[in-house]
Amino acid sequence: MMSLACAFCVQAGDEIVFTTVLENPITPVKNQNRSGTCWAYATIGYIEAELLRTTGKVYDLSEMFVASKDYVDCAEYHVRMHGNSRFSEGGSADDVLEVINRHGICPEEAMARPGSMIGDTLANFTEFFTTLEPYVESIAKGTSTKLTTQWKVGLQGILDAYLGKCPETFTYAGKQYTPKSFAQALGINKNDYVSITSFTHHPFYEQFVIEAPYKWRPRPSWNVTLDEMMTTIDQALKDGYTVCWGGDVSEDGFTRTGLGIAADIEHAPDLTGSDAARWLKLTKAEKAESLKKLGAQTPELVPTQALRQERFDNWQSTYDHVMLT
């Protein structure tokens, strides 16, 4: 498998044809299915790509191990905050690095496969989180004046029932490991990885914690200019590295046809003037269909530092999906 940076052209009939301009090796893509664990799948994929780059070996690491450990950490934090924080399926790349640092990691084969505890072949958190979230909230916002530790037993029971038990020891390639010793053997060090971002509401060339609902761990990012951020990403890809990044899939220009479009509605054919006003009244599905028809011919906005900041401030652009490039 390869991590692709692509350019595209349009052939007759508006068929979108992608041309590969750069490809870096990655492990096979996995399906998060009906689980809000893009953060775990994308970042584990990134770690696997790093191991492939540095060792030449293909590893299949367990996303559910990471999810289980992270939900314990997040639940404990949520309870300490008396419910005044966020507890949900979502997370960030920071969570994966911190889980590996604190708890280690295991291969996929050492733990129950995603979905297998409920008879599915892929992760499905529909029943799981409608059980887990109210349980944690009932503790965090309960009426108790003194908590016992038994709530943690119940929490772990729910996690084990739906995700499977995290192994204390396991055998891999003929050797016995703990999750911590396995992470050490792989050489995974969270301090080897740098997070960068670009906003003007904080000084450039300083670190700050991005204000996003899913980022409950206070791991900071370096703030650089937009041009410097993109130059850094481009250079990393050219040097053979992959990039794990957080973005927005809730905007109208996100499609499932391989295109992410920052549509310039004012200059889009059939969407100008009164049609532009009509555009604002369309449902999300109707907007998606309009963009699908225009495809690669859709006029796009030119991203600027000011536009990025404006859309972050007014909630048009949010941090709601983690991906691997």
Where are these regions (language model features)?
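Bacterial N-terminal signal peptides
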Residues: 1-7
